[in-house]
Amino acid sequence: MFGRVAVLLGGTSAEREVSLLSGRNVLEVLRMRGVDAQSVDGVPALAQALVERRFDRVFNVLHGHNGGGEDGVVQGLMQAFGVPYTGSDVLGSALSMDKVRTKQVWLALGLPTPRYASLSVCATAVEVRKAVEMLGFPVIIKPAKEGSSVGVSRVFALEHLEEAVALAARYEGELLMEQLIEGDELTVSILDEMALPSIRIVPQGQWYDYNAKYLAEDTQYVCPGLDDVAEAEIAQLALAAFHSVGCRGWGRVDVMRERGSGRFFLLEVNTAPGMTTHSLVPKAASQLGMGFDDLVWRILEQTL
């Protein structure tokens, strides 16, 4: 049915460890179901493997950019070889990996997203200060092309600004300074053009950082995260956000709901979400009675 399947994992991005966990989980399911599945670690290895091992399709769980699988580079490689693959194509992957350009598309279409300023990694102290004055505290500072909360800081006062900028500047590309929306953090998974039930994330610490996402055992996940009326609203918004940047197949849209007003604000799109025991897409799918094995199968079926 599927032929020989490459499970693309690992790579050299800042999200390598998460990708390895995701890939091993996917690989285990496929092999258990009798699929001839083999792991391939990173983009250079995939280029060689497509020639030597003649894979029929690729299950992409390579996270991040610059050695990852969410920036359009690996999608272009697979298209050049004519090999079907899971997830978004070149355009959708490249655009959604860039948080600044994604926000520009959303704003042009009238979709709600927090106010922001983009900064180069060489931005002067004066430029950084001007951005803060425009947005007002509190702000979030993050690399524009990383995921998994890598390099992200919440800043509430001027004295912590320099440290936050320095942390984000360790990574390639622009920096994104964004208005911090206080309220509930939610995520909506997309599968086969359908929005799955939202998940409201309740970390035990101050916010949903890398530790809360992948290491902590006390982070709470409420699914569905909203009442029926709000669920319908956030589902429509997430699908619009997903399609507006050219995404397809499966993915995840992260959203904040402002405390008090109840307004939704789009944060980012993930085109190759995690598939670990802590990951959110499997949690949302399970709410509909879909186990992890069936979820993996549904995603791979998109390549047929």
Curated annotation (Swiss-Prot):
It comes from Xylella fastidiosa (strain Temecula1 / ATCC 700964). Binds 2 magnesium or manganese ions per subunit. NCBIfam families: D_ala_D_alaTIGR (TIGR01205), PRK01372.1 (NF002378). Residues 103-301 form the ATP-grasp domain. It holds the Pfam family Dala_Dala_lig_C. It catalyses: 2 D-alanine + ATP = D-alanyl-D-alanine + ADP + phosphate + H(+). Its main location: cytoplasm. InterPro entries: ATP-grasp, ATP_grasp_subdomain_1, D-Ala_lig_Van_CS, D_ala_D_ala, Dala_Dala_lig_C, Dala_Dala_lig_N, PreATP-grasp_dom_sf. Mg(2+) 2 binds at E268, N270. Mg(2+) 1 binds at D254, E268. ATP binds at residues 132-187. Cell wall formation. One of its GO terms (cellular component) is cytosol. Its cofactor is Mg(2+); Mn(2+). This is D-alanine--D-alanine ligase. Belongs to the D-alanine--D-alanine ligase family. Pathway: Cell wall biogenesis; peptidoglycan biosynthesis. It is found in: Cytoplasm. Keywords: ATP-binding, Cell shape, Cell wall biogenesis/degradation, Cytoplasm, Ligase, Magnesium, Manganese, Metal-binding, Nucleotide-binding, Peptidoglycan synthesis. GO terms for biological process: cell wall organization; peptidoglycan biosynthetic process; regulation of cell shape. It is an enzyme of class 6 (ligase). The lineage of its organism: Bacteria, Pseudomonadati, Pseudomonadota, Gammaproteobacteria, Lysobacterales. PANTHER family: D-ALANINE--D-ALANINE LIGASE, D-ALANINE--D-ALANINE LIGASE B. Its EC number is 6.3.2.4. One of its GO terms (molecular function) is metal ion binding. The gene is ddl.
